[in-house]
Amino acid sequence: MELKGSVVNFLGDSITCGVGASSEEKRFTDVLAREFQLQKANNYGISGSRIARQQIITAEEYDRDYCMRLDEMDQSADAVVVFGGTNDFGHGEAPLGVFADRDPATFYGACHFLMSGLLNRYVGKPVVILTPLHRWNEDDPHGDRKPWSVAPLKVYRGILLEVALYYGLPVLDLYATSGIQPSNEVSRARLCPDGLHP
């Protein structure tokens, strides 16, 4: 796909909306727009948001999960990039579920709902999935503050990879290729001082 002059939708969380960037112009969406001469980078990032549905939905913007926001994005865009999963691990209430799930109430189900919805809405257009980056507490099955044990971050990454493979969607596996590892002191100091946001 020729990126120059194209419109790309970016659906994501705090990293997409620019937390950790020193200015709006330094958000990865804006950097990509300049580097590839996009006509427009539509930023649909909401800090703290999750792919899967919360059990109790509040009026807080971050409780508007990716599945809820699917139909709010510019349908005329030439491509879509989805970057998420870290908040599902960190503080999401949804259980993991099983591969057969198709409801946003589980992480598996939400991944299916989102990816199939994107394929239906953006027929013939590229939809790219980005896996979560490593984070400081990625091995804690309680995430940031869950009162119950669910799974480490690598399990959420694995589900994203599995469901994307099922739908034939390309994946940029940032967990495996970003070079960011907050458990390494030098990497954390240079690339993500808070252990989460680059």
Q: PLM features: residue spans?
A:
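Generic structural signal for well-ordered alpha-helices
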Residues: 70, 111-115, 157
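Solvent-exposed polar/charged
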Residues: 34, 120, 162-165
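A short helix->loop->beta-strand "cap" motif at the edges of active sites that frequently abuts
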Residues: 38, 119-127
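Conserved SGNH/GDSL esterase-like catalytic core that processes O-acyl groups on lipids
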Residues: 2, 7-9, 15-109, 197
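Active-site phosphate/pyrophosphate- and oxyanion-stabilizing loops and adjacent acidic/basic residues
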Residues: 30, 116, 158-161
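Catalytic His-Asp segment of secreted/periplasmic serine-dependent ester chemistry enzymes
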Residues: 132-198
